[in-house]
Amino acid sequence: LFDGLYISGNKEICDEYMGKYPVIFLSLKDVDGLKYENAKYRIMELIGREAERYFFLGDSDRLSENEKEQYKAVIALQNGKYSMDENVLTSSLRLLSHLLFQHYGEKTVILIDEYDVPLDKAFQNGYYQEMVSLIRGLFGMALKTNDSLQFAVLTGCLRISKESIFTGFNNFEVLSVLNVPYDESFGFTDNEVEKLLDDYTFSDHYPEVKEWYDGYHFGNTDIYCPWDVIRYCKSLCADL
C-alpha cells in the first residue's frame, strides 16, 4: 500500500506501529440533523458499522459469552436500523476497544476525525446541550481511564473548550496549526510544491503557484493548500 511513499522509508515508525494495534476509526463529518434524535442516530450508525468490521468478535473464543452478547447489542438491528439505547451508545466505543484488546491481546488505537462537526450542527439547530452530553459521555467512557486504550487522536476545525466535553481527561494535549513540531503536517510545504511541479515538468509555473496558493503561515512554515495546488496541476495537464 505504501511502497514508494515517504512513510515506507521510515522503518522505525513502520516497525513500531504498522499493523500492530487494532484501530477504531470514525469520521463525524456527516453527523447532522434538524433534531437531536436524527443526529444521534447518525453517530449510532457510524459506530455500529465500525463494530461490524470486526464481525468475528461475535464468535471469538477469547471473549466470554457476556462479552459476545454486549458486542451483539452494539450491532443489533430493529426494522433494519441500529437499535442501541443511549446507555449502550455511550459505552459503545469503550466496549469495542475492550473487546478488541481481549481478542488481539493488544491495546486499541481510537481515531476520530472532525469530532467537532456534531457540536457545530447541534448549535445551529438548537440541541447543543443534548449533543454535548452525548459526546462528553461517549468520549469520556472511551478515552478516560480506559485500560484497553493505547492512544487516541481527535481532529477538528473548531476549538471546543476542554471544560465542555473533555472534563477530567488525563494526559490530554491540544495541538494546533501554531505548534511548531507539527507545522508541516497541515498542507504542502514549499519544497513539496517545488517537487510536485518538477515531477510534472511544470517548474516554470512555480512563481505563480507561490503567488496564488502560498496562503498560510503555520508555526514557522509557509503552507500551501493541497487541494488548490493539485487542482492547478490538473488544469495544466488538461491544457497539454
What are these regions (language model features)?
Residues 25, 109-113, 137, 150-157:
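Structural recognition of the conserved hydrophobic beta-strand(s) that form the central parallel beta-sheet
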Residues 40-43, 124-130, 164-179, 233-240:
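Short secondary-structure boundary/capping segments
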